[in-house]
Amino acid sequence: MPKHAQVKPHLLYEWDYEKGIIKPKNKRCPRCGSFMAHHLKPVPRWHCGKCGYTIFEK
């Protein structure tokens, strides 16, 4: 059994074949630059697992 789950690119990126652009679906962390996770419970927020930066939504 692998230690980590395989990354599924179709869940992380959006493709625009007409323009030839690939964009990430999630936000980037302003502090370290890695992808942020969107959590809905208990409070909606964006959180960076690498550096701990959190953005709370209103």
UniProtKB/Swiss-Prot annotation:
Binds 1 zinc ion per subunit. GO terms for biological process: translation. A zinc finger (C4-type) spans 29-51. InterPro entries: Ribosomal_eS31 (IPR002906), Ribosomal_eS31_arc (IPR022845), Ribosomal_zn-bd (IPR011332). Keywords: Metal-binding, Ribonucleoprotein, Ribosomal protein, Zinc, Zinc-finger. Zn(2+) binds at residues 29, 32, 48, 51. Its cofactor is Zn(2+). One of its GO terms (cellular component) is ribosome. GO terms for molecular function: structural constituent of ribosome; zinc ion binding. Part of the 30S ribosomal subunit. NCBIfam families: PRK00432.1. Belongs to the eukaryotic ribosomal protein eS31 family. This is Small ribosomal subunit protein eS31. It comes from Ignicoccus hospitalis (strain KIN4/I / DSM 18386 / JCM 14125).
